[in-house]
UniProtKB/Swiss-Prot annotation:
InterPro entries (UniProt xref): Cell_div_SepF, Cell_div_SepF/SepF-rel, SepF-like_sf
Organism taxonomic ancestry: Bacteria, Pseudomonadati, Coprothermobacterota, Coprothermobacteria, Coprothermobacterales
GO cellular component: cytoplasm
Subcellular location: Cytoplasm
Domain of life: Bacteria
Organism the protein comes from: Coprothermobacter proteolyticus (strain ATCC 35245 / DSM 5265 / OCM 4 / BT)
Annotated protein name in UniProt: Cell division protein SepF
Keyword hit for Cytoplasm: yes
Length: 139
């Protein structure tokens, strides 16, 4: 096997040949075709959470999916930390709200942390949550 042949093949593999330069690529559209506005994904820009940021505490006493989901969804989208207290909601309403919140957090790569059976911490992806339970409340 000739050494020059190997290097020539390797070089030709990574570079355009003379035959490739003769090819002219044209963009074309069919008659009557109209470009549509894209509904694709838009990357979410993460922001560092500044010291002294607002933490929202939300405790609904009744459940209205339109109102509650809009309120919480907007704050999740904006990157706020939220403490969600569902102790005043019935089990079905609380589950519906948690399902919505889980989906909203998933879409922004956020996290849901259960503090108790009815209190939850909702954080954006750039916030680390650490737990320390041992010895709390004892001296």
């Amino acid at each position: 096997m000739a050494e020059g042949g190997f290097w020539k093949k390797l070089t030709n593999f990574f570079t355009a040949s003379e035959e490739d330069e003769d090819i002219i690529e044209e963009d074309y559209m069919d008659e009557g075709y109209e470009a549509e506005e894209g509904t694709g994904f838009v990357p979410v820009q993460t922001r560092a959470v500044p010291v002294g940021s607002t933490i929202w505490v939300y405790q609904p006493s009744s459940f209205s999916f339109d109102v509650d989901s809009s309120f919480i969804g907007a704050r999740i989208k904006d990157g706020y930390i939220i403490i969600l207290n569902l102790q005043d909601l019935d089990d079905l309403s609380a589950q519906r709200l948690i399902d919505f919140v889980s989906g909203a957090l998933y879409s922004v790569e956020g996290k849901l942390k259960a503090i108790s059976s009815s209190v939850f911490l909702l954080v954006p992806k750039n916030v680390r949550v650490e737990s320390f339970n041992e010895g709390f409340g004892t001296e």
